[in-house]
């Protein structure tokens, strides 16, 4: 395998890794008699269901929404309006299918973006290669100081 193909494969694998939930390896599926109450709860509990969990109060801070958050919301609403997904699909992929690590580790609208990308690839509106190439292009534009229009102005010289 040539080095350019190997590099492209590694880039694709990196992109896929960003889009998949954290995988927890289990060597075998336990028999029904081996499932303890704790294991049953872990299997059936989804990350956004925090009722009854021991926790501390969170100090609430009002914050101004950022441009990328507003644009993410508008884009996702347009995808729904165009029939790409239903609200139930979005909620399922956004809240249940991402895994606890991603759910608790990403900002709210970050999960919306991840969900939109996953659904567009899953339903073959875009290929993973097209998505990866666009991400690389945007990173290069930001790194070169060109900015991303109103979303991220160019760096002042």
From Swiss-Prot:
It is an enzyme of class 3 (hydrolase). Its EC number is 3.5.5.8. Keywords: Hydrolase. InterPro entries: CN_hydtase_beta-like_N, CN_hydtase_beta_C, Elect_transpt_acc-like_dom_sf. The keyword Hydrolase applies. Pathway: Organosulfur degradation; thiocyanate degradation. Heterododecamer consisting of 4 alpha, 4 beta, and 4 gamma subunits. This is Thiocyanate hydrolase subunit beta.
